[in-house]
Amino acid sequence: MGPIGTEADENQTVEEMKVEQYGPQTTPRGELVPDPEPELIDSTKLIEVQVVLILAYCSIILLGVIGNSLVIHVVIKFKSMRTVTNFFIANLAVADLVVNTLCLPFTLTYTLMGEWKMGPVLCHLVPYAQGLAVQVSTITLTVIALDRHRCIVYHLESKISKRISFLIIGLAWGISALLASPLAIFREYSLIEIIPDFEIVACTEKWPGEEKSIYGTVYSLSSLLILYVLPLGIISFSYTRIWSKLKSHVSPGAANDHYHQRRQKTTKMLVCVVVVFAVSWLPLHAFQLAVDIDSHVLDLKEYKLIFTVFHIIAMCSTFANPLLYGWMNSNYRKAFLSAFRCEQRLDAIHSEVSVTFKAKKNLEVRKNSGPNDSFTEATNV
């Protein structure tokens, strides 16, 4: 379900916990804990593996914080970037920032130390924050796809207003907060005795009922279906119809041709965002599904390492989006450059071209005004 305190923590034997977490240790009374067999040592305790994990997580955090902060900054700063679609994109960036700043540092610490040293409050907060952010991202990507489908496929003249877009964003966070709440509620911060007089602090899922409760499995499978499979199905259907419409559309006039090309490029960019999100989260979702179906997966020697690698792959989606925006969208590329140069206006770059194009656009709009006007407006990102 989340990176902190999975069912593995509760199902390991005392000997397995001792071997994986520590290696040679002494008890508070000075008794030596026997050295574990080399083949039993958890790989995440090896120095070279820990160095790789530190580099991976720190790189994701650094790239994510810089990239997502930049996206939010340019959408707020430049008036021409304040479109409905860009507000939704900025919301994705906020969700990714939550993961970068509130989840990943503590997840890395927990993975390296083998026990939860951050206290009971963060034990409940960190898994909840990650679940919340992922669900916000999924809902936002679905809303973007449905909005573009509505405008482009059906040629609707009325677009979502900025006020309505803020309402949708608020609802996305509210719904996600409710759906992710079990991750905070059904959690236990406790001491686990490894050997007599030797304990570690654990942060684990604790569902009501028996020790191996079905509630956790039901929640995990429901989340997979409602917040991954179903949204991706809706998004795939929407973008398939959008792409079909764009390929079959014939625009009269040079200005409309230009906007048609922009629509295609923007659609490609947003499809790539969805693909990156879906592919990066697929291994972790599949692995969690395997755990839910067969709990013996928890007994794998390298369970923790496999889970950590899949978690790192999933977290790559938190910094990939700004790279895609800068690579595939000229408006974002110009906005990023303007922000780095501390320029106050976005049109400071290629300003003469912008003025000329605006004049041509106004002339073409007067000549070609008609039922396709809404189609032309649909994807100004």
Swiss-Prot record:
Record membrane topology: Multi-pass membrane protein
Stretches of the chain found on the membrane's Extracellular side: 1-51, 108-124, 187-216, 290-304
GO molecular function, one term: neuropeptide Y receptor activity
UniProt-annotated glycosylation sites, renumbered to this chain: N11
Disulfide bonds: C123-C203
Gene Ontology CC: one annotated term: plasma membrane
Gene3D superfamilies associated with the record: Rhodopsin 7-helix transmembrane proteins
Cytoplasmic side: 73-86, 146-165, 238-268, 326-381
Subcellular location: Cell membrane
UniProt cross-references to CDD domains, sorted A to Z: 7tmA_NPY2R
Pfam families in the record: 7tm_1
Record key words, sorted: Cell membrane, Disulfide bond, G-protein coupled receptor, Glycoprotein, Lipoprotein, Membrane, Palmitate, Receptor, Transducer, Transmembrane, Transmembrane helix
Lipid tethering residues (S-palmitoyl cysteine): C342
Region (Disordered) residue spans: 1-35
tRNA processing is among the record's keywords: no
SMART domains the record matches: 7TM_GPCR_Srsx (SM01381)
UniProt entry tagged with the keyword Nucleotide-binding: no
TM annotation in the entry: 52-72, 87-107, 125-145, 166-186, 217-237, 269-289, 305-325
Function: Receptor for neuropeptide Y and peptide YY.
Family in the record: Belongs to the G-protein coupled receptor 1 family.
PANTHER family attached to this UniProt entry: NEUROPEPTIDE Y RECEPTOR, NEUROPEPTIDE Y RECEPTOR TYPE 2
Protein name, UniProt field: Neuropeptide Y receptor type 2
Source organism per UniProt: Macaca mulatta
Name of the gene: NPY2R
